[in-house]
C-alpha cells in the first residue's frame, strides 16, 4: 500500500512540475516579444480620466511625444494637469467660435481629443541631444544637453490652405492625430508635419515629407533613460 501511495505521489509531483514549467516558458516568451509601437501609451497616472474640460494651456515635449494639458473646472481636489501621448486634435469651426465655444478637451482614459481655435498656441519643448561616450562603459549614448522652447499653432493659416473649389475641407474639424513640423527657433511654428487617423499614419506622412522620423519617435528610441544632464537644467532657452 505504501509503495502505491509513493508512486502516486511521484506521478502527481511530475505532472505539477510539467505544468509549472510550461507556464513559466509561456510567460518568458511573451515578455521577450513585446508589441512595439511608434507611440507607446503610458500607464494612466492622471486623476482626471473622463469628461469634457476647458483647456487653459498645452505643452508638447519632443523627448517622448507627450502632451500636458492644464484643465479648468476639474472636480474639487483633483489636479488640473492631464498628460498623454495619445492625443488627437481638431480645429473649432467658425460657428463654434461665434457661439462662444472655448478651447476644450474630451478625455477618455489615456486617450483625449483637443479642440482648439486656430490661434491657440501649444508650447513646444525641444530637446537638443548629443551622442557621447560613457566613460564607465565605453559605449555611445544619446543624451539631452539642453532644452529650448517655442510655440506651435497647428491650425493657424491651415483653414485657408484647405479651401478647394470654394469649399473648406472638413478634415480639420474632426479629431485626428497630428505630428508637429520640424522644430524651428524664433517665430511661432505653424501647421503640421503629418496627420492621420492613427499616430503611425501621421508619422508615415511626416517621414514622406521630411525623409526622417519625427523628433519624438527618434528620441524615444535613442535617449538614455537618465539622459538629463546638469546643462539641461541650467540652459533652457525660450
Model-derived features: positions:
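Positively charged n-region of N-terminal signal peptides that target proteins for export
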Residues: 1-4
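Hydrophobic helical h-region of N-terminal Sec-dependent signal peptides
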Residues: 7-15
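Low-complexity, glycine/proline/serine-enriched intrinsically disordered segments
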Residues: 22-238
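C-terminal motif of bacterial Sec signal peptides marking the signal peptidase cleavage site
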Residues: 16-20
Amino acid at each position: 500500500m505504501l509503495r502505491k501511495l509513493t508512486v502516486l505521489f511521484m506521478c502527481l509531483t511530475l505532472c505539477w512540475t510539467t505544468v509549472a514549467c510550461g507556464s513559466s516558458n509561456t510567460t518568458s516568451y511573451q515578455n521577450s516579444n513585446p508589441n512595439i509601437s511608434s507611440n507607446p501609451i503610458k500607464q494612466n497616472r492622471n486623476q482626471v480620466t473622463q469628461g469634457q474640460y476647458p483647456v487653459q494651456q498645452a505643452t508638447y515635449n519632443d523627448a517622448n511625444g507627450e502632451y500636458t494639458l492644464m484643465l479648468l473646472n476639474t472636480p474639487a481636489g483633483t489636479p488640473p494637469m492631464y498628460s498623454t501621448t495619445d492625443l488627437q486634435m481638431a480645429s473649432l469651426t467658425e460657428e463654434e467660435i461665434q457661439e462662444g465655444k472655448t478651447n476644450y478637451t474630451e478625455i477618455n482614459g489615456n486617450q483625449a481629443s483637443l479642440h482648439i481655435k486656430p490661434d491657440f498656441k501649444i508650447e513646444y519643448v525641444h530637446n537638443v541631444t548629443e551622442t557621447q561616450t560613457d566613460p564607465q562603459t565605453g559605449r555611445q549614448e544619446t543624451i539631452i544637453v539642453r532644452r529650448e522652447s517655442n510655440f506651435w499653432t497647428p491650425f493657424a493659416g491651415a483653414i485657408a490652405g484647405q479651401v478647394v473649389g470654394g469649399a473648406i475641407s472638413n478634415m480639420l474639424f474632426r479629431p485626428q492625430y497630428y505630428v508637429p513640423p520640424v522644430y524651428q527657433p524664433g517665430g511661432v511654428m505653424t501647421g503640421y508635419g503629418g496627420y492621420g487617423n492613427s499616430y503611425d499614419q501621421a508619422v508615415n506622412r511626416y517621414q514622406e515629407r521630411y525623409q526622417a522620423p519625427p523628433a519624438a519617435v527618434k528620441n524615444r528610441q535613442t535617449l538614455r533613460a537618465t539622459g538629463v544632464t546638469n546643462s539641461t537644467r541650467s540652459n533652457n532657452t525660450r
